[in-house]
């Protein structure tokens, strides 16, 4: 009897859309969000004002970071309060000696553009 191999597109989709998660993390790090939240939890409105974020995409951006496990959230929309997840707090807060976000800054500023232009280059 012949065994059929199960074909699954999940790897294709995971890799093909992997930049969604990557760019979300890189952007939050570049903005200093994790350092801001390392001081104390903040409401979405406070984060918007302190980092100059556009209100239209504010909660989508913050909640994407919650879904990815980089932030914690209590409440919803205007009552939301955000804080760093444990690993984000330890490794992505510039005020801590354990900060390793510099490699993410380099990836965002230097490497991401190279990969973005891969087909021309």
Map each language-model feature to its residues.
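N-terminal accessory segments
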Residues: 1-121
């Amino acid at each position: 009897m012949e065994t059929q191999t199960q074909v699954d597109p999940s790897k294709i989709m995971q890799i093909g859309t992997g930049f969604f998660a990557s760019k979300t993390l890189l952007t939050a790090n570049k903005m200093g969000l994790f350092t801001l939240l390392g001081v104390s939890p903040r409401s979405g409105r406070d984060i918007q004002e302190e980092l100059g974020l556009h209100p239209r995409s504010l909660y989508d951006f913050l909640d994407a970071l919650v879904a990815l496990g980089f932030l914690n959230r209590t409440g919803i929309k205007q009552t939301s309060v955000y804080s760093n997840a444990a690993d984000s707090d330890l490794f992505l807060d510039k005020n801590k000696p354990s900060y390793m976000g510099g490699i993410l800054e380099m990836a965002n500023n230097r490497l991401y553009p190279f990969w973005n232009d891969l087909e021309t280059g």
